[in-house]
């Protein structure tokens, strides 16, 4: 017997669908009639298993999917504060687990993103898979195919002031759904040796721009001091 025991209440023994294929999606909804009206379905689609009870908290909580006497299948906590995708908090986007086929840890905020459009993609996927040679520059604009798959626009470095302290900041525009890659921050003192600096930056702001684009602004966790060594940064795009 498979059922949700934390967050919402739903027992899959009562599901309209008794089995699904690998990679197939199954939905449980709060109200079938309202779901069909919102998404333009004349009748309830086959991928809707049924309706759940209780509502998820807008401020985050624990979700647990259990088997049998309570053996956890999935057990995690989500939140609505950074570093979790804050654009999913009241702006109409759903939270999307990135590359679920790789079995990512759902407790980690960086394994989630917002849907590329408001209202989400129930029953479907908004993932854009990469095709082609990652190192080629098919349109001859000086950027590799892999970079253009993940990002658009300019990458901007800046200095911002927080409580009278200067901090480094980095802004870039990410294409939502480009889940075949990781986006990382690297820094260097000499432009020869580069180090991963993801842990040295925190998300300051996420701004949905429409058309499946999101502007992400990161801020260094440490202020800039006069005796700091000059630091350079770059964004590294790598395939999963």
Where are these regions (language model features)?
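Short, composition-biased motifs enriched in small/polar/acidic residues
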Residues: 121-240
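Activation on beta-sandwich/Ig-like modules and their edge loops
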Residues: 1-110, 114-129
């Amino acid at each position: 017997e498979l059922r949700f025991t934390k967050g919402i209440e739903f027992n899959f023994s009562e599901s309209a669908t008794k089995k699904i294929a690998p990679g197939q999606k199954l939905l449980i909804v709060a109200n079938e009639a309202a779901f069909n009206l919102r998404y333009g379905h004349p009748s309830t689609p086959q991928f809707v298993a049924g309706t759940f009870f209780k509502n998820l908290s807008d401020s985050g909580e624990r979700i647990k999917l259990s088997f049998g006497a309570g053996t956890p299948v999935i057990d995690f906590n989500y939140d609505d504060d950074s570093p979790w995708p804050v654009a999913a908090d009241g702006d109409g986007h759903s939270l999307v687990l990135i590359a679920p086929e790789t079995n990512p840890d759902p407790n980690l905020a960086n394994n989630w993103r917002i849907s590329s459009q408001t209202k989400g993609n129930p029953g479907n996927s908004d993932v854009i898979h990469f095709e082609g040679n990652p190192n080629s520059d098919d349109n001859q604009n000086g950027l590799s195919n892999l970079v253009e798959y993940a990002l658009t626009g300019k990458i901007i470095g800046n200095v911002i002031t927080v409580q009278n302290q200067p901090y480094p900041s980095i802004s870039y525009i990410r294409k939502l759904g480009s889940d075949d890659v990781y986006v990382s921050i690297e820094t260097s003192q000499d432009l020869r040796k580069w180090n991963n600096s993801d842990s040295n930056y925190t998300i300051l702001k996420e701004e949905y721009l429409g058309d499946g684009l999101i502007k992400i602004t990161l801020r260094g966790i440490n202020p800039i001091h006069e005796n700091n060594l000059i630091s350079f940064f770059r964004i590294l795009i790598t395939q999963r």
